[in-house]
Amino acid sequence: MPKLQEMMTIVSQREVASNIFEMVLKGELVEEMDLPGQFLHLAVPNASMLLRRPISISSWDKVAKTCTILYRIGDETSGTYEISKLQSGAKIDVMGPLGNGFPVDEVVSTDKILIVGGGIGVPPLYELAKQLEEKNCQMTILLGFASEKVKILEKEFAELKNVSLKIATDDGSYGTKGHVGMLMEEIDFEVDALYTCGAPAMLKAVAKKYEQLERLYISMESRMACGIGACYACVEHDKEDENHALKVCEDGPVFLGKQLLL
């Protein structure tokens, strides 16, 4: 039976952008990681905070048995702030990997891939891009951030082969001034598959522009409680059945575009 919960060891933790932390974890759970886009459910090291925090997996190394997560912290009363205070060598209670990730098996070398990410929705797209790199397909990656202060993973994406990378910031402090949707308007090729994760407004814009695309994969960000589909705290509307609720933690977080009513 797969291992789904473990006291993982924190290898390192550092602030990589304004209020955004990178944590490297080590443990046996890494062996279960295969699909990019899945998430971990972390217990907060504070007995008064009962709910776990869902954080997407940015990348992993099965040889080293390590995985990397990036997350944004809240104020001093938040669970993520408590997690950010943990030091190297500490243990943290982790469930995962949970949810359904991005499918990559169907991708072939002739495919033209578009990846669109915004803010803290960018991290799960990095492992996706790493796996697509092995397919030798052409990737265009569009990333949007509020400002240069919160820009993450640019170097990591840029080092991948067959990648065209463009960045937009809302305030114009880096790259193109404006939202990432403006970069989509510059796409002049037929997209074979599109993968996206970010804020609801961005996802809605992507879904509208590419609603006819069969291979449109959308990763939803949502507040969660149980993380395993039991509590219905993270539901989205099903486009094909208005009486059916899609659970982000169990049915997602990755959905086909045609499934979601955004």
Curated annotation (Swiss-Prot):
Molecular function as annotated in GO: 2 iron, 2 sulfur cluster binding; electron transfer activity; flavin adenine dinucleotide binding; metal ion binding; oxidoreductase activity
Annotated residues for binding of FAD: 53-56, 70-72, 79-80
Needed cofactors: [2Fe-2S] cluster; FAD
InterPro entries: Cyt_c3_hydrogenase_gsu, Dihydroorotate_DH_ele_sf, Dihydroorotate_DH_Fe-S-bd, Dihydroorotate_DHASE_ETsu, FAD-bd_FR_type, FNR_nucleotide-bd, OxRdtase_FAD/NAD-bd, PyrK_electron_transfer
Cofactor note: Binds 1 [2Fe-2S] cluster per subunit. Binds 1 FAD per subunit.
Domain FAD-binding FR-type: 3-104
Annotated CDD domains: DHOD_e_trans
Xref: Pfam families: DHODB_Fe-S_bind, NAD_binding_1
Record-linked PROSITE patterns: FAD_FR
Binding site for [2Fe-2S] cluster: 226, 231, 234, 249
Single GO biological process annotation from the record: 'de novo' UMP biosynthetic process
Pathway field: Pyrimidine metabolism; UMP biosynthesis via de novo pathway; orotate from (S)-dihydroorotate (NAD(+) route): step 1/1
Record's keyword terms, sorted: 2Fe-2S, Electron transport, FAD, Flavoprotein, Iron, Iron-sulfur, Metal-binding, Pyrimidine biosynthesis, Transport
Family of this protein: Belongs to the PyrK family.
Subunit structure: Heterotetramer of 2 PyrK and 2 PyrD type B subunits.
Its job: Responsible for channeling the electrons from the oxidation of dihydroorotate from the FMN redox center in the PyrD type B subunit to the ultimate electron acceptor NAD(+).
This protein's name: Dihydroorotate dehydrogenase B (NAD(+)), electron transfer subunit
